[in-house]
């Protein structure tokens, strides 16, 4: 029996009804979330494919933790009926629906069936007929691509295993003749602040209502406790943490200020988010166009699958996937082997993987210890509505890693 995180918005996959769902590769580790239950079931052989949604990485985190392939489409490319729409308001983070599969070809097979189906259009009338373009699915085979990459996003440093596979993927693609260009994420700390504010545009109250009068699983109690902290106290904590850990400071202080005024009308909320989002979006896309990129490769997540007790303390990691919900870019996960003993050794080496006094990095190191043998992956992103190109690059990466 598998489950999803109670209340969602967590990669601690547990609930008070069904207990804890474990990673198929190690029962001491989480499969991720919030679509972790279906991914774990699929990877364990319980289904031929899995399904899920993705508001901040809920497809991509489980896929990277469990060794599955997935794609978060642009919002609107694949729609569903009778599901929650994520955070309220038109300026919320983009929500995508997708599948867990073993290969990229299986992703293409399932998307072709749905996106070109008149029957599907009848079931979901607000879904336009937007079939996959077969010619664009082979773009990586037909010409050499110009692909951007980054090993660190400038907000949360990934552990050695997660950065290693990006570097190796870049080398493998260069051997095939593709051009790889180092990409610098513009203003990552500001983008991260906007992302964390965007998760809960109405403040913590919206999510706390979900937990009200419910039995809270032990693994989520820290998360719920943090949600209950007064905003003034969060501001003070954020200031103190700014001298110790920038990521923790940003996460602690990223709430919508003047909340009572913002709650008066939805319009004020949307204007607040969209104004700053537009600046980040322009900076990102302008750099993309300057480099004439076809796609972008980066770490799938900052860490492989972690022990069950850690997700509530690793909220700083969510930006790795949430960035592409903020931008509404299609983003996919491709498995790239497993963590090795050298990765574990380098993680423990302070001279190589420096943490200093940064609490966030110290927690990350503790969470990632002894991960040898666990799946690791890379993430591929393209501009909005270029799912075909994203899938094509994913297939190219899959090919070089399976040689």
Regions found by a protein language model. Give the residues of each.
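Flexible loop/turn segments at secondary-structure boundaries
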Residues: 5-9, 57-60, 154-158, 189-191, ...
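A short helix-breaking turn/cap at a secondary-structure junction
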Residues: 69-170, 176, 183-187, 358-360, ...
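Short, well-ordered beta-to-alpha junction loops that form the rim of enzyme active sites
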Residues: 3, 152, 298-302
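Acidic carboxylate-rich catalytic motifs and surrounding loops in phosphoryl-/glycosyl-chemistry enzymes
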Residues: 2-4, 182-190, 335-338
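Charged, often glycine-rich, active-site loop that binds/positions anionic groups
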Residues: 14-19, 192-206, 346-350, 354
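Glycine-rich, small-residue loops and helix-cap segments
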Residues: 48, 163, 167, 180, ...
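Short acidic, glycine/serine/threonine-rich loops at helix termini
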Residues: 9-13, 60-65, 82-84, 93, ...
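Short glycine/serine-rich loop segments
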Residues: 1-114, 327-335, 377
């Amino acid at each position: 029996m598998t489950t999803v995180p109670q209340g969602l918005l967590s990669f601690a996959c547990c609930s008070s009804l069904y207990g804890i769902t474990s990673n198929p590769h190690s029962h001491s580790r989480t499969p991720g979330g919030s679509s972790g239950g279906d991914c774990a079931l699929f990877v364990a052989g319980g289904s031929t494919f899995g399904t899920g949604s993705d508001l901040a990485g809920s497809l991509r985190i489980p896929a990277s933790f469990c060794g599955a392939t997935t794609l978060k489409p642009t919002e609107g490319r694949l729609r569903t009926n009778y599901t929650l729409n994520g955070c309220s308001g038109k300026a919320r983070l983009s929500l995508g629906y997708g599948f867990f599969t073993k290969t990229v070809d299986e992703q293409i097979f399932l998307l072709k069936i749905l996106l070109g189906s008149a029957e599907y259009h009848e079931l979901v009338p607000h879904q336009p007929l937007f079939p996959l373009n077969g010619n664009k699915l082979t773009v990586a085979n037909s010409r050499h691509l110009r692909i951007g990459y980054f090993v660190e996003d400038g907000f949360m440093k990934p552990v050695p295993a997660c950065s290693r596979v990006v570097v190796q993927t870049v080398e493998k693609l260069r051997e095939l003749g593709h051009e790889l260009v180092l990409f610098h994420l513009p203003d990552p700390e500001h983008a991260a602040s906007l992302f964390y504010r965007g998760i809960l545009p109405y403040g913590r109250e919206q999510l706390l209502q979900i937990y009200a009068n419910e039995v809270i699983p032990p693994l989520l109690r820290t998360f719920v406790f943090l949600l209950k902290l007064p905003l003034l106290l969060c501001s003070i904590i954020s200031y103190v943490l700014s001298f110790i850990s920038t990521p923790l400071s940003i996460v602690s202080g990223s709430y919508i200020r003047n909340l009572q005024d913002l709650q008066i009308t939805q319009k004020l909320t949307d204007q607040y988010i969209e104004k700053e989002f537009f600046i980040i979006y322009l900076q990102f896309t302008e750099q993309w166009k300057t480099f004439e990129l076809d796609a972008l490769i980066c770490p799938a997540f900052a860490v492989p699958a972690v022990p069950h007790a850690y997700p509530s303390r690793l909220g700083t990691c969510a930006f790795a996937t949430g960035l592409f919900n903020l931008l509404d870019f299609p983003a996919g996960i491709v498995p790239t082997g497993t963590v090795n003993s050298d990765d574990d050794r380098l993680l423990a080496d302070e001279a190589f993987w420096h943490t200093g006094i940064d609490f966030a990095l110290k927690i990350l190191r503790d969470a990632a210890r002894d991960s040898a043998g666990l799946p690791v992956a890379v993430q591929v992103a393209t501009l909005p509505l270029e799912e075909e190109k994203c899938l094509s690059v994913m297939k190219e990466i899959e090919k070089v890693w399976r040689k």
